[in-house]
Amino acid sequence: MATIAIIDYGMGNLRSVQKGFEKVGFEAVVTADPKVVLEAEKVVLPGVGAFRDCMRNLEQGGFVEPILTVIQDGRPFLGICVGMQLLFTDSVEFGLYQGLNVIPGHVLRFPEGMRERGEDLKVPHMGWNQLSIKRRPSAFSDVEDGANVYFVHSFYAKPDEEGVVAATSSYGIDFCAAVWKDNIVATQFHPEKSQAVGLSILKNFALSKA
């Protein structure tokens, strides 16, 4: 049984996530086999690219049912970037596309014309930004309020229930930077690119029981 399975569905820099786990002393298997995902103790869903394409690849790769089974079984599950967005009901990127609907809510685009401190803000939101911690899953046990993490995204998730928001950040608007629901932790930012803070998240996720 693979302790940690990173889903390879053709969308994302999977090796960087795998190397992140290696840096904190854990082996993670990158797999395109739904059976390996189904048998894993912990599962990571990264994601880079368009929501529509990511969801299509999950479906075509046969990953949807294994993902839902892992989540329903209560096994630790980590979503990263678009991997977080896919957990929501739908996204308006390039139309309206259905997600996994594990966390009720919608994925929206940053509005045009945002300004902050008198400056126009460009989309995508790219670079380092601060977290405001709202709730603290075990994966965030070493993350300080105000910690800086690395983002690259034009869309953000808006949960129907505020209670699932683990952290927010601000870029013209306050937006959900991380969610926590039962055995699911998911981040809009990239822990594998967020240096010591991100590595602590990967380490504590690897140590988590649920």
From Swiss-Prot:
GO MF annotations in UniProt: glutaminase activity; imidazoleglycerol-phosphate synthase activity; lyase activity
Cross-referenced Gene3D superfamilies: 3.40.50.880
Catalyses which reaction(s): 5-[(5-phospho-1-deoxy-D-ribulos-1-ylimino)methylamino]-1-(5-phospho-beta-D-ribosyl)imidazole-4-carboxamide + L-glutamine = D-erythro-1-(imidazol-4-yl)glycerol 3-phosphate + 5-amino-1-(5-phospho-beta-D-ribosyl)imidazole-4-carboxamide + L-glutamate + H(+); L-glutamine + H2O = L-glutamate + NH4(+)
Keyword hit for Hydrolase: yes
GO biological process assignments: L-histidine biosynthetic process
CC annotations in GO: cytoplasm
Entry-linked Pfam families: GATase
Pathway(s) this gene product operates in, as recorded in its UniProt entry: Amino-acid biosynthesis; L-histidine biosynthesis; L-histidine from 5-phospho-alpha-D-ribose 1-diphosphate: step 5/9
Enzyme Commission identifier(s): 4.3.2.10, 3.5.1.2
Superkingdom to which the source organism belongs: Bacteria
Keywords per UniProt: Amino-acid biosynthesis, Cytoplasm, Glutamine amidotransferase, Histidine biosynthesis, Hydrolase, Lyase
Intracellular or extracellular location(s): Cytoplasm
Domain (Glutamine amidotransferase type-1) ranges: 3-210
InterPro entries membership: Class_I_gatase-like, GATASE, Imidazole-glycPsynth_HisH
Record: active site: C81, H190, E192
Subunit structure: Heterodimer of HisH and HisF.
HAMAP family noted in UniProt: HisH
NCBIfam families: IMP_synth_hisH
PANTHER family documented for this protein: IMIDAZOLE GLYCEROL PHOSPHATE SYNTHASE SUBUNIT HISH
Physiological role: IGPS catalyzes the conversion of PRFAR and glutamine to IGP, AICAR and glutamate. The HisH subunit catalyzes the hydrolysis of glutamine to glutamate and ammonia as part of the synthesis of IGP and AICAR. The resulting ammonia molecule is channeled to the active site of HisF.
Protein name per Swiss-Prot or TrEMBL: Imidazole glycerol phosphate synthase subunit HisH
Native species: Geobacter metallireducens (strain ATCC 53774 / DSM 7210 / GS-15)
Underlying gene: hisH
